Amino acid sequence: YAHIPENGYAWDLICRKAMAAPDGLTVLLLGPATNLAIALLRYPALREHIRGVILAGGSFGFGDVRPYAERSVFEDAYACKVLLRSGIPVSMIGLSAAADAALTRKELETALRPLVGEELPGCLRDLTVHRLGDRYVIPSLAAAAWMLDPAAAVTDHFHVEVEVDGTEMYG
């Protein structure tokens, strides 16, 4: 687990870490972009110190909380919009991309049991929000794997927008 400071704000910590990184910081974003967006708005020079963001979120063609919205983006669509308009390179590993890396329960158990032991049932419950038949789709795991080995997936460039006007397409 990461060390969480006892006081202060996440956006200040993001800024300090990025400014201190000699080659800039790559951010692995596993939930809503709220703290990163606040950091970008509070510290405009920060964007020059972030090499890129890998976002476990979004989707192409289907959603999990609404027909077209994925949870991480939906929970703070405005923050995601700030991130996407920041000029920082963003690599999105959404539901549709993570579905290609879906794992069976046995594969998950084999990978996770040495790490979490007796906590495995709870860990599986918390991690496996999405299922495709007997396979588990875990965007966070797919994003982390791609961060460690970009050759693990085929990528493409797209222009992405986030709907924030409260329509059915919100998020």
Regions found by a protein language model. Give the residues of each.
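Conformational coupling and interaction surfaces
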Residues: 74-78, 86, 90-171
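Active-site histidine-anchored catalytic micro-motif
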Residues: 1-105
